[in-house]
Amino acid sequence: MKKIHFIAIGGAIMHQLALALQRQGHHISGSDDEIKDPARSNLNQHGLLPKQEGWFPEKIDNTIDAIVLGMHAKANNPELLKAQELNIPIYSFPEYIYEVSKNKKRVVVAGSHGKTTITSMIMHILKYAALDFDYMVGAKVEGFSESVKLSDAPIIILEGDEYPASIIEKKPKIFFYHPHISVLSGIAWDHINVFPTYENYTDQFVHYLSHMQSDASLYFNETDDEVIRLVKQAATHIKSIPYGMPSYHFENNQPVLATKEGPIKVNVLGKHNLLNMQAAIKVCMELGVAEAMCYDAIASFTGAAKRLEKIIDTEGLIAFRDFAHAPSKLKATLQAVRENFSDYHLIACFELHTYSSLNEAFLKEYNHSMEGADEAIVFYSKEALHIKGLEDLDSNAIKAHFNTHGLHVFNNKEDLWNYVHSSVNSQTGKPICLLLMSSGTFEGIDWTPIKTV
């Protein structure tokens, strides 16, 4: 067993890796300058919560076998400097995941959107089929108590991410996984702070595809023109298999797939999720699960946390929260809800929270992204702008960039709550669907008591 120290142990996925390695019997320690829930509670429950927040170079000595370095840590982090001085092996999160999965069949789900959902669907099917597998996923998935599992299983399912691995290893995380099977779900510019141009962003996927080993399999979204372009450019040396939209119809607002096994009712919303489902099924079939069993399994899939997650279902009101934050995700999520709840009054509320979305240079990418809502709302936090070192945004500029008729913009959470509360409780005709889209929390607003009439 190894002694492993985590620099920035409080990260959402970092602390899950720490817990997974502890379950394997390794001795784990860690530090961070800020640890919030759920990481704080999870670490405390398992005896891994640091006694004090901050960085302590005295924790680093030659008895440590490995350092796992989180993206949150800066280059001048005193613990990192001490580890470098002592020549202790330093791994980014993805490098360590690869280190412990070298002898496994690695499945990597990559792309600009749909990664968490496809990964979750694959996990759900494999569990239903009783296959032994490890995994790493960026959200809580129903039926799984952890986000990271490591064991002696022969397969590992990995949600791939094009964001840099760490402050000292700035290549995208997906570069380190070396998949035997991969999915490319879609391409849409993201992470403007790291990839300032669209070409710079897509170059990362060209590199990823071109460096896949020749005996690997790639399942790609044939409905995405950019995906097709990149596959033709960089994936001619591997087996590339397209997936597309299945045949389906609706029964009582529920999609019903037309399959060889007959009609299959599924519990997901939106064409994008039906596409995601096809990717997951194809991967699982390559892993040895029969097609009929894949469809049996997927019928009971209900989604990952914050992916069109139903949070309110009461008379006259249904509400969903979704992780959507990039323009393509907004469009797909809105379209999904509009299609399933066409007879509802749709109130769509989006929080600008990521570095990209809060950067005025990127806002033009949101042009018409909120079309389809009966009421469209954009919220941003001045505190988030301050933390990210960005200039204040102008409400009129936001309205111009979104180019959506009647768009309301708020930067105060009380004003946002009051507007949504009034709108939800003043509708007298149609039932209401409230769609909350953010990678943040709307400054901690609890939406459950929103309907009072």
Predicted regions and their residues:
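ATP-dependent carboxylate-amine ligase
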Residues: 1-38, 43-51, 63-67, 83-88, ...
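The start of beta-strands in P-loop NTPase/AAA+ ATPase cores
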Residues: 3, 133, 154, 180-181, ...
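Phosphate-binding loop of NTP-binding sites
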Residues: 20-24, 45, 58-59, 71-220, ...
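Short, polar loop motifs at secondary-structure junctions
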Residues: 33-36, 54-56, 71-74, 95, ...
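Beta-strand->loop->alpha-helix junctions that form or flank phosphate-binding loops
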Residues: 52-55, 91-98, 136-139, 234-252, ...
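A generic structural signal for residues located within well-ordered alpha-helices
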Residues: 117, 272-275, 325
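Short polybasic amphipathic segments
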Residues: 254-259
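Short pre-catalytic strand/loop immediately N-terminal to key active-site residues, enriched for Gly-Thr
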Residues: 264-269, 317-321
